[in-house]
Amino acid sequence: MTTGDADVTVKNARIHVEGAIRSAVWCGGESHLKVEDSVIDSKDADPFDNDFRSLSVPMMKCVPFALGLDGNCRATNVLEAGQVTYENSIVVAEKWAPLSTDSGYPPTSLTVKNVLAGVGALEEAVPGKAYTATKTVAGKTWGYTMGGSGYVAYGDGGVTNLFEDCQFY
């Protein structure tokens, strides 16, 4: 998580989160976050669990029902004038929003280069097992299997998202 005017670089990291509104990467304020050679994924909370049902927060705890999607944990959430750059990485959300901006204003943005991003499941690749896609990051090969109901990338009006040499599923 970055906020204020922070300038942070994350390199060769493995970030995995589970639970409602527990974004793996959260960037707000006027901060800059660069993620390189890393593997990021998020897994939803069980929406029928009592802890989830009793959760009261001042923000969305799941994707709006009217969108016809399912999910309660984004892999990336960029807010305000935050800026996130991903390079040579994997970003997966189990059901909703691997790469998302929310309630931002210019220049809130994502810059995404040479990234595999998708909605579904991620694991260290098992030889001989079929995957939707595989990608090697920092010397380790990962297997991605498409699933879930959500979008890969989303940007609020007025923001800029740039994508180069990416695989979206």
Task: Give residue spans per PLM region.
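Short linear interaction motifs
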Residues: I15-E18, G68-D70, V91
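All-beta strand scaffolds that present successive hydrophobic residues in beta-strands
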Residues: D7-A13, H32-V39, M59, Q83-N88, ...
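Internal alpha-helical scaffold/solenoid segments in large eukaryotic proteins
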Residues: V17-S23, A93-L99, T108
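Acidic/polar low-complexity surface segments
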Residues: M1-T2, G29, I40-N77, W96-P106, ...
